[in-house]
Structures are given as structure tokens and as C-alpha cells.
Regions:
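Acidic/histidine-rich helix-loop elements
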Residues: 41, 45-66, 89-93, 130-134, ...
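Bacterial N-terminal signal peptides that target proteins for export
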Residues: 1-8
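Feature marks short, surface-exposed loop/turn motifs that line or immediately flank catalytic pockets
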Residues: 54-56, 86-90, 123-125, 168, ...
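Residues embedded in well-ordered beta-strands within globular domains across many folds
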Residues: 49-51, 81, 163, 204, ...
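Extracellular glycoside hydrolase catalytic/binding regions
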Residues: 29, 61, 133, 143-161, ...
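Aromatic-lined substrate-binding rim segments of carbohydrate-active enzymes
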Residues: 64-126, 141, 183-198, 277-296
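N-terminal signal peptide c-region/cleavage motif recognized by signal peptidases
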Residues: 16-18
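N-terminal carbohydrate-binding accessory modules
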Residues: 21-79, 208, 329-333
């Protein structure tokens, strides 16, 4: 075969097969319809996910890699939450941190996992007072972070959710005051910035008491379309039996809006890292997963890490902890049915 014909043959073969950039999977855009998450094809999505630890921390320890995501996929996850601490964002710098996020988003895309980007602060954003130094931020920095995320990921369908602020709390007045109206205004301002910068990701809004309490939503919801709400109903937030209290505090929201429990989990009183409010046993796991299954609520388990608590595994061979054994089985069972 002449060289010119060989060249033409190779060119046609390349076009037929496609370049690597062309064959990377693009996930279906997720949007809000009523109280559900819907794909572009009209499929209802109820997510079962896992929390990564901070990508900055994982990269420093050599574990921010595709193998980490592959293991989450094996556990049955359909959603991965990236908790971005303000201190890590500042110390690494915007451009370098975006490179970390881009790698994670690319691995998630290849594996068919959707992503939540979470601004992982705890405290009172109105007063700019926080639970401890690692959560320190400002209103301006928070707005700028979301402008950056919106611009950067506006055309990326894998990044399905922006969790605007991890855990709002005034810590019983130790961090001053913040009314629901004041919090609502901050969240609505953030959503305006995100939307004006072209992002289609769904904003996730938490309530007070470390993101547990959504009772204010009943009479005074966030004034924005296409959003979802968040709760972190750890076991010690309420005494058993939990279910009726959950419904009164946050579960009622799922009748009208999509709801994502972006942190759930438990550990025994003598387990490594045991602390308030996560101490419990498998009865909590059974109750919270059953409640979510019954009510079509998405959840993300905290945390896929052997150091942060309550941890899901004990070592980098991914040996499950007590809660890890429970949730791995629950996620895999749900994945098998769906």
C-alpha cells in the first residue's frame, strides 16, 4: 500500500475510533423537578454516596488517585462529596486546588460518579466566626469561591451539586447570632452569583444546628428555583426512636423539595475517633437507610478515610470499620437493585 493510502487509512481509523478526549464519558445533566432529581433523559435519581476527605489532604498523603475512586465505586457509591476546607483552599492556592478538583472530577466521570463540591466551613458566616481555625473564611472569600466554581464547572455535568456552606451554627450564642432571614439572604446571594456565572449545578442549602434543622423551610423557604436542601442527622442529634423527630425536624422537606443528607454515619463509644454527635450502633444505620429508602431521600456517608471520624475503613487496604461494614453492604445492595 502506498504511503499516501496508509496515511489516509490511519486518519480514517482515528476518526472512527475517536480521540481519547472524545470517548470520555459525559454524565447526564441532573436537574430538579418537583421534589426529585431528574436526568436529561427523565430518569429519577436517588443518590447513595460517600464523602471523600479533603482532596488537599488526600493528595499530600498520596491517595488522591483513581484507585481511591475505583474503591468508592466498588462500595456502591453513585455520588462523591469533596469537602474543601477554606484553609486548604487558601494555602494551596486557587489554581493548584482547581487542578486537584479537576483530577477528581475526571476520575469520577470515567467511573460514572456524580460530584458534590462542598465549601467545608463550620460556624456563623454572617459574623465570620467559626468553630475553629480550619473553618475560617469571609463572606467575600465564600462568594469568590462560588464564582470560581461556577465559572470553572459551568459546562461540566459530573459536578451536579454545589453545597454552599457545610454546617451553619452559632454554637448556642458563642459565635453570636444569625437569624434564618439573615442566613437565607446570604444563601440567596450565593445562588445569584452561581447562576449569573453560568453554572447549572444544583445549589444545596443547609439549616442551623450544624446543618441538622430545616424547620424554618416550612414557612420561609429559600427564594430560588431548582435548589435542594441538606441535613446532617447524626445519631445523637435526637434520642431514639428517631423517625418521627426526623420528620418534624427535616424529613418533611422531602415532600416538596429534593433532600440530600450529605453527612450520615456512626461509631461505637469505644471506637477510634468516637465523639458527639456520632456515637451509636447499627440500629442507627438501619433506621436512617430505611427512612431514606422509604422517602426517596439521597444520602452521603461520612467518611472514606482511615483517620477522620467516623471513618469507614481502618487502613489503605480499605478494611471496613464497624460502620463501614454496614454501609458498604447497604450501598452495594441498593446499587444492585438500581
Amino acid at each position: 500500500m502506498k504511503a499516501s493510502k496508509i496515511g489516509l487509512f490511519l486518519l480514517l481509523l482515528l476518526v472512527a475510533v475517536g480521540s481519547p478526549a472524545q470517548i470520555i464519558t459525559k454524565l447526564s445533566q441532573v436537574r430538579v423537578q418537583g421534589n426529585k432529581f431528574i436526568t436529561a433523559e427523565g430518569k429519577t435519581m436517588v443518590f447513595r454516596g460517600l464523602n471523600a476527605s479533603d482532596p488537599d489532604r488526600l493528595e499530600k498523603s498520596g491517595h488522591w488517585d483513581k484507585a481511591y475512586f475505583e474503591e468508592m465505586k466498588r462500595w456502591g457509591a453513585t455520588l462523591v462529596r469533596f469537602p474543601v476546607h477554606p484553609t486548604a483552599w487558601r494555602s494551596r492556592g486557587k489554581d493548584q486546588y482547581l487542578q486537584l478538583l479537576d483530577k477528581g472530577v475526571a476520575w469520577a466521570t470515567e467511573l460514572g460518579l456524580y460530584v458534590v463540591i462542598d465549601w467545608h466551613s463550620i460556624g456563623n458566616l454572617k459574623n465570620e466566626m467559626y468553630q475553629n481555625g480550619m473553618y475560617e473564611t469571609t463572606q467575600k472569600e465564600s462568594f469568590e469561591f462560588w464564582r470560581t466554581m461556577a465559572e470553572h464547572y459551568k459546562d461540566n455535568t459530573t459536578v451536579a451539586f454545589f453545597e454552599l456552606f457545610n454546617e451553619p451554627t452559632v454554637m448556642g450564642g458563642k459565635l453570636g447570632t444569625c437569624s434564618w432571614d439573615e442566613w437565607k439572604k446570604l444563601m440567596e446571594e450565593t445562588i445569584t452569583i452561581i447562576r449569573a456565572n453560568g453554572a447549572k449545578a444544583i445549589p444545596l442549602v443547609a439549616g442551623f444546628n450544624w446543618a441538622y434543622d430545616l424547620r424554618e423551610v416550612a414557612q420561609n423557604p429559600i427564594k430560588a428555583e431548582g435548589i435542594a436542601y441538606v441535613s446532617h442527622p447524626y445519631p445523637m442529634k435526637r434520642e431514639k426512636p428517631w423517625e418521627d423527630k426526623w420528620t418534624a425536624d427535616w424529613g418533611f422537606v422531602a415532600k416538596k423539595y429534593p433532600l440530600v443528607l450529605t453527612e450520615i454515619g456512626f461509631c461505637g463509644p469505644d471506637d477510634k475517633g468516637a465523639h458527639v454527635p456520632v456515637i451509636s450502633d447499627e440500629s442507627y444505620g438501619e433506621a436512617i437507610t430505611r427512612y431514606c429508602d422509604t422517602n426517596g431521600i439521597s444520602y452521603v456517608v461520612w467518611v472514606f478515610d482511615p483517620q477522620w471520624a467516623p471513618m469507614l475503613f481502618t487502613d489503605w487496604s480499605y478494611t471496613p470499620t464497624r460502620q463501614g461494614r454496614y454501609f458498604k453492604k447497604a450501598l452495594q445492595a441498593y446499587s444492585a437493585k438500581n
